[in-house]
């Protein structure tokens, strides 16, 4: 069609007059991974239902680049609180402006940490417009064109901060009707003073589940995140019970969220062999080391530590590696916590991270130290300084989650250690 001086070609129309948009493939290829090797939840509060969830991100200039970074952080933080799997929650992420750019597709068989990494690297566009109609058309035909998981709920989280020109919105209502026919729930999140309230109200009128969240700006996203997750999680059905005993010990209900009457998402207790590694160098100091211990206690309190559930081992390291607790010792929460409280700071003038990782690879995760062959191997490493020695690649069956603390933590080094899992960075030991 002709729009002013611009001639635009479109794909042929589907029955009913709707135009099928061209396919825009995700930015990254889909690398398979083993679904049965779990990545542990990063937060106590998270959702584990049958859900296909699509994030639509406004890429217009109405959000500054800094504000768009906050928007991305909200998406990544939400993903951290979802049980992402082809068997549970699948996610797609699309940035929209005058067109639509898919960064993640529902069928992407990647580790959750890799999906979050891709989402965190979405480029800021800052275009003059962001067409809600175009991205809804894209989602209707390209993402939900074929319903391959009818047992799962289908939800779109529309993160919008701008208004499209009226000429682009002529089929807006028709797309909404298409979603209703396919039983797709559309949750608009209006951000800031320029969000299109008229379109948001139209979305709400289509179905009672299409609840809108109106925010004064991106700074409210984090405050409302758990409320939004809780709402969309309640829209989805429970996953069916497994036909044979899985690696999950049991399911417990997490604490409810204040101000929300419906039950919250659920938390799994995984069967894991977990080694906690704490830096205890002179650079860290005794006071900060003790804060690392307090953090360790809080994490263990939330775990299902038991003979049949999660097993814990603890190391501290600096110039040398000190073994504080092994998998062979009593695996009850009370015993582990008592020993953690008794750990004494060792100090040392080096940060031999490579030596610590080599030790746990060769010794901690060995049958002689109580490692279980059927349990996934996970490492949480708290460090605040660059390694003093060489770090060698660990076997593929050991997943390391580094927690870098303070300005001296080496980003590139920790990313190499953790790949494909994204390291966690915090400002200080407080």
From Swiss-Prot:
Q: In which tissues is it expressed?
A: Plasma.
- Taken from the UniProt record, the cysteine pairs bridged by disulfide bonds within this chain are 9-12, 47-233
The GO annotation for biological process reads:
activation of blood coagulation via clotting cascade; blood coagulation; cell adhesion; cell-substrate adhesion; cellular response to cold; cellular response to lipopolysaccharide; extracellular matrix organization; hemostasis
UniProtKB keywords? Blood coagulation, Cell adhesion, Disulfide bond, Extracellular matrix, Glycoprotein, Hemostasis, Repeat, Secreted
Q: What subcellular locations does the record give?
A: Secreted; Secreted, Extracellular space, Extracellular matrix
Sugar-modified residues: 6, 23, 30-31, 252, 261, 290, 349
The entry's comment on post-translational modification says: N- and O-glycosylated.
Pfam families this protein is in? VWA, VWA_N2
InterPro entries named among the record's database cross-references: ECM_Assembly_Org, VWA_N2, VWF_A, vWFA_dom_sf
Q: What is this protein called?
A: von Willebrand factor
- Which organism is this entry from? Rattus norvegicus (Rat)
Gene behind the chain: Vwf
């Amino acid at each position: 069609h002709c729009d002013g001086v611009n001639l635009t070609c479109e794909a042929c129309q589907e029955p009913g007059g709707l135009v099928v948009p061209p396919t825009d493939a995700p930015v990254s290829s889909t690398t398979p991974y083993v679904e049965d090797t779990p990545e542990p939840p990063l937060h106590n509060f998270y959702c584990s239902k049958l859900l296909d969830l699509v994030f639509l991100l406004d890429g217009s200039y109405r959000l500054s680049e800094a504000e768009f970074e906050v928007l991305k952080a909200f998406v990544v933080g939400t993903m951290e609180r979802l049980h992402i799997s082809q068997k549970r929650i699948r996610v797609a992420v699309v940035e929209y402006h005058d067109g639509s750019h898919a960064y993640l597709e529902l069928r992407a068989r990647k580790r959750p940490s890799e999906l979050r990494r891709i989402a965190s690297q979405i480029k800021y566009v800052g275009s003059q417009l962001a067409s809600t109609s175009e991205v809804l058309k894209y989602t209707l035909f390209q993402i939900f064109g074929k319903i391959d998981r009818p047992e799962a709920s289908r939800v779109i989280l529309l993160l919008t901060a701008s208004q499209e020109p009226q000429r682009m919105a002529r089929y807006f209502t028709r797309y909404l009707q298409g979603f209703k026919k396919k039983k797709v729930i559309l949750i608009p999140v209006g951000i800031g003073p320029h969000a299109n309230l008229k379109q948001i109200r139209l979305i709400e009128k289509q179905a009672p589940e299409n609840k809108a969240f109106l925010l004064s700006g991106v700074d409210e996203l984090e405050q409302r995140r758990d409320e939004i997750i809780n709402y969309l999680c309640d829209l989805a059905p429970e996953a069916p019970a497994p036909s044979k005993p899985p690696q999950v010990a049991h399911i417990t209900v997490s604490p409810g969220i204040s101000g929300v009457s419906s039950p919250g998402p659920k938390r799994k207790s995984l069967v894991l062999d977990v080694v906690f590694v704490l830096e205890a160098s002179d650079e860290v100091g005794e006071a900060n080391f003790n804060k690392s211990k307090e953090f360790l206690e809080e994490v263990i309190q939330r775990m299902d530590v038991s003979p049949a559930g999660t097993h814990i081992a603890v190391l501290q390291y600096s110039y040398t590696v000190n073994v504080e607790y092994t998998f062979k010792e009593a695996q009850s929460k009370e015993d582990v916590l008592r020993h953690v409280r008794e750990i004494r700071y060792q100090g040392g003038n080096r940060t031999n991270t490579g030596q610590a990782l080599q030790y746990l690879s060769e010794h901690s995760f060995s049958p002689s130290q109580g490692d279980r062959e059927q349990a996934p191997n996970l490492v949480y490493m708290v460090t605040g300084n660059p390694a003093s020695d060489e770090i060698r690649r660990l076997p593929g069956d050991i997943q390391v989650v580094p927690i870098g603390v303070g300005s001296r933590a080496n980003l590139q080094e920790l990313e190499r250690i953790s790949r494909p899992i994204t390291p966690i960075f915090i400002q200080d030991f407080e």
